[in-house]
Amino acid sequence: MTDSKSNSNSPSLSYKDAGVDIDAGNALVERIKSVAKRTRRPEVMAGLGGFGALFELPKGYQEPVLVAGTDGVGTKLKLAMQLNKHDTIGIDLVAMCVNDLIVGGAEPLFFLDYYATGKLSVDVAASVVEGIGAGCELSGCSLVGGETAEMPGMYEGEDYDLAGFCVGIVEKSKILDGSKVAAGDVLLGIPSSGPHSNGYSLIRKVLEVSGASLDDKVGDTTLGQALLEPTRIYVKPLLELFKNVQVNALSHITGGGLLENIPRVLPENTRAQIDCASWELPPVFKWLQEQGNINAVEMYRTFNCGVGMIVCVPAAEAANAIAQLKQSGEDAFEIGKIVAAEGAPEVDLLNL
């Protein structure tokens, strides 16, 4: 039997001695509360601090269907850390989740975040959460909770990782699943703000081989600013569009670019034809292509190339859809069409 008595000559250890500062975590929670309050929807039934968030289903639905999604922002975080700019990366986190939900026709209801770090910096984490709150306000959903994990030894210093989780709601009869897509439908593009939150491992490789500085000019901004521009949130304009226009499908252009994401919402025996000459490649993508010597097909299967969301509508609805989106502040434009084809859906890139 071993002696379980403590060694009186050794110091009394605390959680903080092991690298976990409970007081810092509590201080962060206090700063988060005001952010959560700004995003609060009437269906939220309790504040932060409980073991689980309570949320009442909105009224007015006959057959409500819940839609859930989770995502992160990938290695864009490395650039945020490099530039010590953390106030917009939270917008990216929310955008990646809520833009996926709207593709199914769902209105985002509530959001939770996961923040993991080696050593908690309350100021950095609070800045990130401010961005999350801004993203929730832009998409109309409530920040109802989250988890802050301080894990010394798992992450280097104050480096951190993020994950987001979102739940939305849609009437069963109004789910967008691509089943109504038909030959002759028109594809409309809604502009992105830049690479959004995808392709950053390739972006960082281009930065490495080019030797470029993040202070270099690209278009009318710096390279660093162009690459950290937050992901656009399309939720509110699209929810408004649903009220006035028949939308057959949406495609959120994320990892995999146009080539991989458009087929995800197309039925069998259809294919998308995209006219790449229908919009100009934004400066940051031109820079990446030139400095990385990236071929055109690789560009369109890695990046959004200036189009963050694609809207599929019947041809007769195209002009109305463009007008409605412009009323909501979105400069939508026609980029292609759906044609009949045998087999699994694919994308034809025309005028590359």
UniProtKB/Swiss-Prot annotation:
CDD domains recorded: PurM
Q: Which HAMAP family match?
A: AIRS
The organism is Saccharophagus degradans (strain 2-40 / ATCC 43961 / DSM 17024)
Q: Which gene encodes it?
A: purM
Which compartments does it reside in?
Cytoplasm
Q: What is this protein called?
A: Phosphoribosylformylglycinamidine cyclo-ligase
User: What GO CC terms are in its UniProt record?
Assistant: cytosol
Pfam families attached here?
AIRS, AIRS_C
Family membership, please give it.
Belongs to the AIR synthase family.
| Keyword Chaperone included in the entry's annotation | no
PANTHER family recorded for this chain?
Answer: TRIFUNCTIONAL PURINE BIOSYNTHETIC PROTEIN ADENOSINE-3 (PTHR10520:SF12), TRIFUNCTIONAL PURINE BIOSYNTHETIC PROTEIN ADENOSINE-3-RELATED (PTHR10520)
Query: Its GO biological process terms?
Result: 'de novo' IMP biosynthetic process; adenine biosynthetic process
Q: Which Gene3D superfamilies match?
A: PurM-like C-terminal domain (3.90.650.10), PurM-like, N-terminal domain (3.30.1330.10)
Catalyses which reaction(s) = 2-formamido-N(1)-(5-O-phospho-beta-D-ribosyl)acetamidine + ATP = 5-amino-1-(5-phospho-beta-D-ribosyl)imidazole + ADP + phosphate + H(+)
> So what EC number does this one have?
6.3.3.1
Which UniProt key words apply to this protein?
Answer: ATP-binding, Cytoplasm, Ligase, Nucleotide-binding, Purine biosynthesis
For this protein, the parts annotated as crossing the membrane are none
Q: Which pathway is this protein engaged in?
A: Purine metabolism; IMP biosynthesis via de novo pathway; 5-amino-1-(5-phospho-D-ribosyl)imidazole from N(2)-formyl-N(1)-(5-phospho-D-ribosyl)glycinamide: step 2/2
Q: Which GO terms describe its molecular function?
A: ATP binding; phosphoribosylamine-glycine ligase activity; phosphoribosylformylglycinamidine cyclo-ligase activity
Keyword Cytoplasm present in the record's keywords: the answer is yes
